[in-house]
Curated annotation (Swiss-Prot):
Pfam families associated with the record: DUF179 (PF02622)
Coiled coil spans: none
Any single GO CC term annotated in Swiss-Prot or TrEMBL for this entry: cytosol
Signal sequence interval, chain numbering: none
NCBIfam families according to UniProt: PRK00228.2-1, PRK00228.2-4
Family: Belongs to the UPF0301 (AlgH) family.
Protein name: UPF0301 protein ML0028
Organism of derivation: Mycobacterium leprae (strain TN)
InterPro entries tied to this protein: AlgH-like
Amino acid sequence: MVIRPEDPEDYVAPAAQRVRAGTLLLANTDLLEPTFRRSVIYIVEHNEGGTLGVVLNRPSETAVYNVLPQWAKLAAKPKTMFIGGPVKRDAALCLAVLRIGADPDGVAGLRHVAGRLVMVDLDAEPDLIAPLVDGLRIFVGYSGWTIGQLKGEIERDDWIVLSALPSDVLVGKRADLWAQVLRRQPLLLSLLATHPIDVSRN
């Protein structure tokens, strides 16, 4: 259940996390729309213009090598393109996890998002990026909300706002990231991780 603050503009979620770049949106158990069911969305931008994020747990069958071969070596396994959301499926967006201690300042093609996460310009030179990152993920499309739209969905309990770990962005194809994120939360939230993937079994 979402905590209701006194100021409706300062909406927060169960872990008292404000929506901002670097947080996660976790689909609540009642959100059954196929595009976002059990989705984990990493917020890349959140400002007065709206909110932009990418779904972390929707791998495609398209190999990175077949689309952007120059980046295949740096792509985390599985080395496939991930479906970031329903908006602009003809565009690609890349996130990378910096190595501990790496400094992206002044490096052409890198833009800091939050913590150890950076956005990578896919026109940049991979050899310049490689020494700085543990791995990267390339997304086709993204998830977007206009001003106030995401606020309404959170108030409707469609989403849970939680902290992200750098490893969330590079999680493997076989991992159930939705359940993993919930299991590391306090007791009441962690219990949601047992919610069946097939709701007919509930």
